[in-house]
């Protein structure tokens, strides 16, 4: 339900089409799911709602690193798998989207211990920095407490999510159903991203959305439409109703619309699919698990401008940074909720949320093309305690609240705190213009991604609970979801569906 793909010229796509799989959402995960499902031979239609909904990932940089800040093995595996797969995806699509600048995690020894353990187990090369002096010697633009330690690696970096989605879309549509080649803006995209040696290009100097589409019904394609409901009746093919009056029919529908999934599932009246012996059983969505357990958190990011000279000299080799700025604050993320409505799932402590509350992430200077923010080089910082939306509101109010938040400029108080942390961390950097941006994350009590089957026979698969860190490893997450999708398609075929 979010976006960066193609316009519908010169060929208009029929309003009703039939595909093996319809993916609602053309963000980092949705585009990856679509590409990997297409690679298995299925026909795919991606519904891209960028004209009606604002996405949280719509930025120039998202971190991806070989460690997970909370030391979770599944997230680390996705990080590593995605990092390994980036070169092939970039080569096949002709789109450069990954900047390999390394990553750094800095905090108390106890805070860094779990990531170090996971890096060691995964066989990832890293450097240990024994105190604040060692950190500052290696990274002279940083200033951290003497009691802090750090671990750094050379494998991590950041992705430009808009370019990564382009790459996924191009490869998906090159892998057209029936072994026919369908390209979308391929040649133009290759020209836009061919300057590999240019530092501006390497760090994100182009939005580069597709300019044209030549995909037809029943081939792999992206359509600029808005999903308003998903219909899944027993014994019938599921389909997605669009605001444009069309229907995208499929054997299976994947919901990958980020913050909008929960509202879409509820307004569609979808039920959860559970196993009862050898049969599927439909039950109401459970607020303690799966999609219904997702909580939406308002997030604010700060973009701090630096001069082009500083970006390309002093800070040229700066890694991404995860920094524990408040070691004494160790309560769970949900303690900071502004919602009066609570459930057991909502009040339980999340390791991820607790970690976020006491830490920030920082990206090295990235060149933003303008106009918002104005063209220039910016260091980005975000993190801190969650600020949850009210769970009591109905689906329409939730979507409207999301629209209003994403149309604003974030929380000024949070931005002020982020600025204080950034200046303390990088006191020798001359920051110029400050720009605040809104973001939203989908959180769960256990900090894990949610993949849930909905509707009769599990014909709808919902993916959510990204915890604010799924854009970087989205390729591997998409591959994992695609495996489940393909397996479900095989089960349907076995039943004669």
Which role fits each region the language model picked out?
Residues 13-29:
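Beta1/beta-strand and adjacent pyrophosphate-binding region of the FAD-binding site
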Residues 183-188, 215-238:
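A conserved short coil-to-beta-strand element within the FAD-binding core of flavoproteins
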Residues 32, 65, 232, 241-420, ...:
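Flavin-dependent oxidoreductases
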């Amino acid at each position: 339900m979010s976006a960066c793909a193609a316009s519908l010229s010169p060929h208009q796509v029929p309003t009703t089409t039939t595909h093996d799989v319809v993916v609602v959402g053309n963000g980092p995960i949705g585009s990856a799911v679509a590409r990997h499902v297409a690679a298995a031979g299925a026909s795919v239609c991606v519904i891209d709602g960028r004209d009606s909904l604002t996405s949280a990932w719509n930025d120039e940089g998202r971190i991806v690193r070989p460690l997970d800040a909370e030391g979770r093995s599944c997230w680390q595996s996705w990080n590593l798998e995605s990092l390994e797969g980036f070169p092939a995806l970039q080569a096949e699509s002709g789109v450069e989207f990954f900047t390999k600048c390394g990553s750094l995690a800095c905090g108390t020894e106890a805070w860094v211990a779990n990531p170090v353990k996971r890096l060691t187990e995964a066989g990832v090369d890293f450097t240990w920095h024994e105190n604040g002096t060692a950190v500052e010697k290696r990274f002279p633009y940083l200033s951290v407490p003497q009691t802090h330690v750090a671990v750094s690696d050379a494998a991590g970096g950041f992705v430009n999510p808009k370019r990564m989605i382009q790459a996924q879309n191009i490869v998906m549509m090159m892998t057209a159903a029936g072994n026919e080649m369908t390209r979308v803006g391929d040649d133009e995209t290759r020209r836009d991203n061919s300057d590999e040696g240019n530092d501006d290009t390497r760090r994100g100097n182009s939005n580069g959305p597709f300019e044209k589409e030549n995909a037809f019904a029943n081939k792999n394609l992206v359509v600029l439409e808005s999903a308003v409901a998903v219909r899944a009746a027993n014994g019938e093919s599921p389909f997605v109703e669009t605001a444009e009056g069309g229907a995208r029919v499929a054997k299976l529908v994947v919901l990958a619309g980020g913050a909008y999934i929960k509202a879409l599932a509820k307004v569609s009246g979808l039920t959860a699919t559970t196993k009862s012996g050898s049969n599927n059983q439909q039950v109401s969505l459970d607020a303690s698990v799966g999609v219904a357990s997702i909580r939406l958190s308002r997030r604010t990011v700060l973009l701090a401008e630096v001069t082009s000279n500083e970006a390309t000299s002093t800070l040229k080799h700066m890694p991404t940074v995860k920094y524990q700025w408040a070691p004494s604050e160790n309560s769970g993320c949900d303690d900071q909720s502004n919602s009066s409505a609570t459930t057991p799932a909502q009040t339980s402590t999340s390791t991820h949320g607790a970690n976020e509350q006491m830490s920030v992430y920082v990206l090295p200077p990235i060149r933003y093309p303008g106009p918002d923010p104005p063209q220039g080089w910016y260091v980005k910082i975000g993190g801190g305690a969650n600020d949850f939306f009210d769970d009591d509101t109905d689906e329409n109010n939730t979507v409207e609240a999301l629209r209003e938040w994403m149309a604003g400029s974030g929380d000024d108080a949070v931005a002020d705190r982020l600025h204080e942390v950034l200046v303390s961390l990088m006191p020798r950097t001359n920051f110029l213009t400050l720009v605040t941006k809104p973001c939203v994350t989908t959180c769960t009590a256990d900090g894990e991604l949610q993949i849930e089957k909905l509707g009769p026979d599990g014909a709808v698969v919902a993916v959510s609970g990204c915890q604010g860190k799924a854009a970087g490893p989205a390729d591997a997450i998409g591959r994992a979801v695609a495996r489940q999708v393909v397996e479900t398609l095989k089960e349907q075929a076995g039943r004669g569906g």
